[in-house]
Amino acid sequence: MYVVCSDLESIYVPEIWISLAKKTGIAEFNITTREEPDYDKLMKRRIEILKENNIKLKNIQEVLAEESPFLGAKDFLGWLSSVARLIVVSDTFVEFANPWINKLGNPILFCNSLIIEKDGFIKEHVMRQDNGKKKVVDAIRSLNYKVIAYGDSYNDINMLMQADHGILYCPPDTVKEQFPQFPVAYNYNELKDIISKILN
């Protein structure tokens, strides 16, 4: 039996920080794990920028409430849930992701959390585990399941490598070129075809 592990942002929903960059005009928010593989370093800098610009958690949540999942995402997940079990494995934070997970039909989400100050500013981020995506795959495989994993960026690679089948979904050229061993899908139909071939 297969379990599917997938990333969240850039797969089913927009990148949270890119949405914030568009809303605030702060260009540095456009930097994601596609450009900066060190997620801890990236998040510490993001939190600094939020404080420098007087942006609180509620402001971020208001921006995200205006966003919708990508066209076709919910239908794709409906199909996927009929053929396998899905766990969304993301480096994002439950305080950001819950509204989107609701819009996607409430798949299981494994992610991280934030420490919020009394005045509403984000104090720091708390990673549930180091290298959490890989450890999720390890745990599932230890239960004698096979794993299909897909993601788009550097922080997904360990998860893809640890899975029985890894797939890149709409990756930047730099990631695709560095990891040519993974098949690439550029839309949900292509992803569905790759997964269907694995399952059959």
PLM feature segments, named:
Residues 78, 138, 157-158:
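Alpha-helical segments flanking ligand/cofactor-binding loops in enzyme cores
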Residues 194-200:
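Short amphipathic alpha-helix with an adjacent loop that forms part of the alpha/beta core around
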